[in-house]
Regions:
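Short, intrinsically disordered, mixed-charge
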Residues: 120-127, 171-174
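Non-catalytic DNA-recognition/assembly elements of restriction-modification systems
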Residues: 1-20, 151, 155-167, 171-183
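A short glycine-rich beta-alpha junction/loop motif
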Residues: 95-103, 131, 135-156
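Sequence-specific dsDNA recognition surfaces
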Residues: 11-23, 37-70, 77-80
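Short coil/turn segments at secondary-structure boundaries
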Residues: 23-30, 49, 133-135, 181
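A generic structural signal for alpha-helix starts
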Residues: 5, 109, 113, 126, ...
Length: 183
């Protein structure tokens, strides 16, 4: 790690917010809920099958998605696909919420880390298989060990370096997408 980078944890960088499900107390609001089923195999958000349910208006006010939020699968997964899959929400704020099988990481200080950089950072950790060490399994359901997940070290370069890293990653992914389409 370069000397100019700093090290912190997810719990210091982000607010973690648990998801919700159907409401019990009126007034209700009918909203779209992002679920594990909306995570694509390439870690994107699939809008084609969003579940719309009635949730408590007061709860939705505290648990709606904001542009730049990271949605983390905390329950579900499988032996081949551990929990911890993360997607970046790049949509309008206040439109959707997220299910009780997920949680959101919301960056506390945008002058510290870019949400896209953190998304790619967590994706790299996931792809290396490190999430397997941060899960438990009971009756076939895999659960993220939140304390381990939120305590993992995050190495942070300057914002300008983060922007350069994100740009390089996205250039590579664009090239790969073009290659895949041409096959």
């Amino acid at each position: 790690m370069p000397d100019s980078w700093s090290t912190t944890t997810l719990k210091d960088l982000c607010e973690s917010i648990n998801g919700l499900w159907k409401g019990k107390k009126e007034p209700f609001i009918h909203v779209g809920i992002i679920r594990n089923a909306n995570f694509t195999k390439d870690f994107k958000l699939d809008y084609s099958n969003i579940e719309y349910i009635d949730v408590e208006q007061q709860t939705f006010a505290k648990r709606h998605l904001m542009n730049g939020d990271l949605i983390v699968e905390k329950s579900g997964g499988s032996d081949n696909n551990p929990v911890g899959r993360t997607i970046l929400y790049e949509g309008k704020s206040g439109v959707f919420s997220f299910s009780n099988f997920t949680m959101v990481l919301r960056i506390k200080h945008s002058n510290t880390i870019l949400s896209k950089f953190l998304y790619y950072y967590i994706l790299a950790i996931y792809q290396k298989g490190a999430m397997r060490l941060m899960q438990t399994q009971t009756t076939g359901l895999h659960n993220l060990i939140l304390d381990k997940f939120l305590s993992m070290p995050i190495h942070i370069p300057s914002l300008s370096e983060q922007e350069q890293i994100v740009e390089r990653i996205e250039t590579i992914f664009t090239s790969l997408d073009m290659i895949m389409e041409s096959l």
